[in-house]
């Protein structure tokens, strides 16, 4: 009997695992429970909504000239939305330091905190390719440390791949070592937020001949290191077009114009979650707000505040738990015996009001 129960438990666990793109489905993985993605939004989900997106999927889209969709998200609810919309890639970015935690830069966030975000996203998104950022300080010092950090992102964070910022030779070497360890890597060139100390702030790149050439050279170096894709951030459209043409791997643009292989925006930004993003004084010039969720949220919170202050919430329809009138009497008597006369009166008064509203069940 015990053996049968164990077999049944193992079968149930296998059904609940989220298959990763880089490990066989039969591998031991205590991953998150799959969501129902069969009813994914029609605008982009299509017939293949339930099929896992892999690096091979992206290569196929790139080969066919089909744009790749990427959204940066940081938690379970946003991951569920990204998943149901049929987005190709969900990137768990180190920009969580700014968007979620309120820092001025991406530098403060640690690998351990990033792993928490990765796990939350992995529980919510079962269809997209999941890519986790390597935060500043966890991969630059040596290839060994880079590989160790990347392994944690997959094993502990439940990601399919990692992203790292390119530029310095040490970062290119880190990318190469991680790929050689069997982990898919997405590169990142142009404005690399982890290097703002060198760049002098969040400034567009590729606006001079030398800077533009460096963007293309770095992208090519990341491709040579084995990256399956490269993010191009805040570079002029001609520079992004040149990099896209020069590379054999997909480019993902953010503030890089329409000539990239795909596009990425931050979940909070594209939804208009706030009047302006917390991590910017104004909405980034490259960010189109596809919604005005922030206005809806503010309106709902204001209405909640007003209804609480006027005592109109909660009303009868949101006070679902009942107690019979006879039990209220017994409860009041018990309170009086405890010397809590005012509490007994409060209970009786509440019951009387509920009875007027037809809330209180009849005595049995």
UniProtKB/Swiss-Prot annotation:
Q: State the reactions this protein catalyses.
A: 3-methyl-2-oxobutanoate + (6R)-5,10-methylene-5,6,7,8-tetrahydrofolate + H2O = 2-dehydropantoate + (6S)-5,6,7,8-tetrahydrofolate
Coarsely, its chief localization is mitochondrion
Q: Where does Mg(2+) bind?
A: 94, 133, 165
Keywords, comma-separated and alphabetical: Magnesium, Metal-binding, Mitochondrion, Pantothenate biosynthesis, Transferase, Transit peptide
- One Pfam family recorded for the sequence: Pantoate_transf
- A GO term, aspect molecular function: 3-methyl-2-oxobutanoate hydroxymethyltransferase activity
Residues annotated to bind 3-methyl-2-oxobutanoate: 94-95, 133, 163
> What note does UniProt attach to the cofactor annotation?
Binds 1 Mg(2+) ion per subunit.
The record's subcellular locations are:
Mitochondrion
Enzyme class at the top of the EC tree: transferase
Which residues make up the transit peptide? 1-59
> Coiled coil located at which positions?
none
Q: Which InterPro entries match?
A: Pantoate_hydroxy_MeTrfase, Pyrv/PenolPyrv_kinase-like_dom, Pyrv_kinase-like_dom_sf
* GO cellular-component term (any): mitochondrion
Task: State the family it belongs to.
Answer: Belongs to the PanB family.
Q: Check the record and name the PANTHER family matching this protein.
A: 3-METHYL-2-OXOBUTANOATE HYDROXYMETHYLTRANSFERASE
Query: What protein is this chain from?
Result: 3-methyl-2-oxobutanoate hydroxymethyltransferase 1, mitochondrial
Top-level taxonomy: Eukaryota, Viridiplantae, Streptophyta, Embryophyta, Tracheophyta
- Its gene name is KPHMT1
């Amino acid at each position: 009997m015990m053996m049968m129960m164990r077999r049944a438990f193992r079968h149930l666990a296998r059904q609940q695992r989220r298959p990763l793109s880089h490990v066989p489905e039969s591998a031991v993985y205590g991953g998150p429970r799959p969501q129902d993605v069969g009813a994914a939004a029609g605008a982009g989900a299509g017939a293949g909504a339930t099929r896992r997106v892999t690096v091979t999927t992206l290569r196929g889209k790139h080969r066919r000239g089909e744009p790749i969709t990427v959204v940066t998200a940081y938690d379970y609810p946003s991951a569920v939305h990204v998943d149901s919309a049929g987005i190709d890639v969900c990137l768990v970015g180190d920009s969580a330091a700014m968007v979620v935690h309120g820092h001025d830069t991406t530098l403060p966030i640690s690998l351990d905190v990033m792993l928490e975000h990765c796990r939350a996203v992995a529980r919510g998104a079962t269809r997209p390719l999941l890519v986790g950022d390597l935060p500043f300080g966890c991969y630059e010092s040596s290839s060994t440390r880079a590989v160790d950090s990347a392994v944690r992102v997959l094993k502990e964070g439940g990601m399919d791949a990692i992203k790292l910022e390119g530029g310095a030779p040490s970062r290119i070497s880190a990318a190469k070592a991680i790929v050689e360890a069997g982990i898919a890597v997405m590169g990142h060139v142009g404005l690399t937020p982890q290097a703002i100390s060198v760049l002098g702030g969040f400034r567009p790149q590729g606006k001079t001949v030398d800077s533009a050439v460096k963007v293309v050279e770095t992208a090519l170096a990341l491709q040579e290191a084995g990256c399956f894709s490269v993010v191009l951030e805040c570079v002029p459209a001609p520079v992004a077009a040149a990099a896209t043409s020069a590379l054999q791997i997909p480019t993902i643009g953010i503030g890089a114009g329409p000539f990239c292989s795909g596009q990425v925006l931050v979940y909070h930004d594209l939804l208009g979650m706030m009047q302006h993003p917390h991590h910017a004084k104004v909405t980034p010039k490259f960010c189109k707000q596809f919604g005005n969720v922030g206005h809806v949220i503010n309106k709902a919170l204001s209405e909640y505040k007003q209804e609480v202050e006027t005592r109109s919430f909660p009303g009868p329809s949101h006070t679902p738990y009942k107690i019979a009138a006879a039990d209220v009497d017994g409860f009041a008597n018990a309170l009086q015996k405890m010397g809590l006369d005012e509490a007994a009166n409060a209970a009786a008064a509440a019951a009387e009001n509920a009875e007027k509203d037809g809330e209180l069940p009849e005595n049995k």
